[in-house]
Amino acid sequence: MDYKNSGVDIEAGYKSVELMKKYVKGTMRPEVLGGLGGFSGAFSMESFKNMEKPTLVSGTDGCGTKVKLAFLLDKHDTIGSDCVAMCVNDIACAGGEPLFFLDYIACGKNYPEKIATIVSGVAEGCKQAGCALIGGETAEHPGLMPENEYDLAGFSVGIVDEKDIITGADLAAGDVLIGMASSGVHSNGFSLVRKIFSMDADTLNTYHEELGKTLGEALLAPTRIYVKALREVKEAGVRVKACSHITGGGFYENIPRMLPEGKHAVIRKDSYEVPAIFQMMAREGKVEEQMMYNTYNMGIGMIVAVDPADVDKTIAAMKAAGDTPYIVGEIKDGEKGVTLC
C-alpha cells in the first residue's frame, strides 16, 4: 500500500506545478522575491515608501456554485479569473491596489492539465488586476469529492495610503452614483440559476438570439475586473467617496454597505438597459423583480459615488479603461438604505 493507492497522486501534483509555471510567470511584479514552489511567497514593500501611512487591505472569496457550470461544460479556463475578480474588486472598493494573490484548489482527483487550465484563468485575472500570483495550493481529496469536481478559493492583499481609503464617511446629498456595466451574472446566485434552467448539455449549448450566444456561454462569462477603471479614475484626480461591488445580495444588500448613517441612495432602473440574460432568467424562472435586484447585479457590477463636479472626469477615465459607465442615481439625505425607482 502506498499514498497513490489511497487516491493521492504526488507525481500528478508535481506535473501540475510544472504545467502552471508558464502562466504564473506572466503575472510577476518587480516586488516579488523568489519563485514558484517555495513554502511561502515573499513580496517587497520597499517601493511604497512614498506613502505617508501605507495600509494593507485584504480579501478572500470563491466562485460559489458557478464551478458546477464549468464541470457541466467541461470548460475550465475562465473560472480562475472569476475567483480573482471576486477578491480584487473588493480590495479596489477600499481604494486598494491589489499586490498579490494566492489560490487554493481542492479536487477529487488531480488531473494536471485541468488544474493548469484553471490556474491559467487565475493568472489571466491577476494580469488584468496587475497583481502577482505568488503562491497557491492544490489539495487532492479522494473520497471527499467526486473525481471530476473541484472548488477554488482566492486570497488577495493590496495596499492603499491610509488617507486614500474609501470609507463613504463624507458622502453628501447630491453626490452622483456611477455604475460600471457587468459582463453578466458574474459569480453569485448560481444556485438559483441552476433551478431556473435545466443543467444539461442540450440546454446549455442551445444558441439564443436574444443573448447572441449559447446559454452556457452567457452564464459562464467571466466576472469583470474593475481594478484598472478605478486606478484610472484615481489617476485622473478624482476622489471616489464611496464604492460598492455588486455581488451576492444585489443592489439591496451591497449599496447600503458603502453608506454612512443619514445617507440614502436612489437608483434609477431606467438609467441603463438590463442585459438579456437577466431578463431571460426572470422570465423563465418566474422570479419577481425585487428578488432579481436582491440577488444579482442586473448589469451593474460596481458603483462609485463622486462629487458632481467630478462626473465627467470619472466617466472619461472609466471609458479609457475599457469599461462602460452609466449615471445610475444620486445620494440624498435620509435613512441609510437604497431605493430603486
For each predicted feature, which ranges?
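Residue-level signature of catalytic and energy-coupling elements of molecular machines
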Residues: D9, D61, G174, H245, ...
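Residue-level detector of flexible, active-site-proximal loop/helix-junction positions
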Residues: V17, K49, G64, E140, ...
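Short, acidic (Asp/Glu-rich) active-site segment that either coordinates a divalent metal cofactor
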Residues: D151, D164-L211, L215
